[in-house]
A protein has these predicted regions:
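Internal acidic/polar
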Residues: 12, 21-24, 110-135, 139, ...
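A short, charge-rich alpha-helical start-of-domain segment used by transcription regulators
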Residues: 22, 29-52
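C-terminal edge and immediately downstream basic/flexible tail or linker adjoining helix-turn-helix-like DNA-binding
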Residues: 2-11, 112, 172-173, 189-215
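Arg/Lys-rich amphipathic alpha helix in sigma70-family domain 2
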Residues: 77-84, 94-115, 135
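DNA-recognition helix of helix-turn-helix
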Residues: 97-101, 153, 162, 167-168, ...
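Sigma70-family region 2
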Residues: 32-33, 56-60, 69-87, 106-108
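Amphipathic alpha-helical segment used for protein-protein interaction
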Residues: 33-36, 125-158, 163-173
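Amphipathic, Lys/Arg- and hydrophobic-enriched alpha-helical face
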Residues: 43-61, 77-78, 146, 198
Length: 215
C-alpha cells in the first residue's frame, strides 16, 4: 500500500496551535458535527506536536513525514469518538505513540529478517540534523542509544524526558497504570544515562554545552 502524505499546510507556513481550552472545545464541536475544515484545523494545530513526537522517538529520517500522515489519517477516522475537549490532545498523542511503537517493532523485525536470511542490511535512512557537526554527531549517537530501548520503554522515555509529561499523563497516553509508567520511565532513564556516561562523544558534548550555558 502506497504511503499517503498530507499537504494541508505548506512547509513554510506558520502553524496555528490551539492556545486555550476554549479552542479545543470549539474544535471538538467541529469534529462531532462534522463541520467542513475540521481536519485541516486539526492538522495545523497539532502537526508540530505529532511531528516532534515521531522525530524524538525515531530520530530524523526520511520516513517521518509518512508516519505523521499515518497518525493524522487514523485521527481523522476515529476522532468522532472523543467526548471531552480536554481529551483531544491526549487522544492524538496516544495514536502517535502507538504508531511509533508499531514502527519500532517493524524495524526490529526487518533487521532480524536481514540477519537470519544473510541478505544485505537495510539501507540506513537519511538523517537530517543540525548544522553544527558536533551537535549532529551527538544526535546520531543519542538516537542509537534510544534505538536500543524496547518500544514501550522508548515511548515512556520520549514522553517523560523529551515532552515533559508527568507519570499520570504518560499512563493515560500509553494506557497503563501509574506504577507501570513509573517503572518504564525509570528503566529507560537508567539505560540512557548509563550508555551516555560510557559514550565519550556524548559526554564531552554535554559537558561543553553545560559550560557554555553556565558561562
Amino acid at each position: 500500500m502506497k504511503a499517503v502524505t498530507l499537504h494541508f499546510v505548506p512547509p513554510s507556513a506558520p502553524r496555528r496551535p490551539l492556545s486555550t481550552t476554549q479552542d479545543e472545545a470549539e474544535l471538538l464541536v467541529a469534529i462531532v458535527k462534522g463541520e467542513a475544515g475540521w481536519q485541516r484545523r486539526s492538522f495545523e494545530a497539532f502537526h508540530g506536536l505529532v511531528h516532534g513526537l515521531v522525530l524524538k522517538s525515531l530520530g530524523p529520517n526520511a520516513e517521518v513525514s509518512d508516519l505523521v500522515s499515518d497518525v493524522f489519517l487514523m485521527f481523522f477516522e476515529s476522532a468522532h469518538r472523543i467526548r471531552e475537549a480536554s481529551a483531544v490532545r491526549s487522544y492524538l498523542v496516544s495514536i502517535t505513540m502507538n504508531r511509533v511503537r508499531r514502527e519500532v517493532r517493524r524495524r526490529k523485525h526487518r533487521k532480524l529478517l536481514y540477519f537470519f536470511t544473510g541478505g544485505p542490511p537495510p539501507e540506513v535512512a537519511h538523517r537530517a540534523g543540525p548544522d553544527d557537526p558536533k551537535a549532529k554527531a551527538a544526535l546520531i549517537h543519542l538516537s542509537r542509544i534510544v534505538d536500543e530501548l524496547n518500544a514501550d520503554d522508548r515511548a515512556a522515555f520520549v514522553l517523560s524526558s523529551l515532552e515533559g509529561m508527568d507519570l499520570e499523563e504518560i499512563g493515560n497516553v500509553l494506557g497503563v497504570s501509574h506504577s507501570t509508567a513509573k517503572r518504564r520511565v525509570r528503566r529507560a532513564n537508567e539505560h540512557v544515562r548509563k550508555r551516555v556516561s560510557r559514550n565519550a562523544l556524548l559526554s564531552d558534548y554535554i559537558r561543553e554545552k553545560t559550560l557554555r550555558r553556565n558561562g
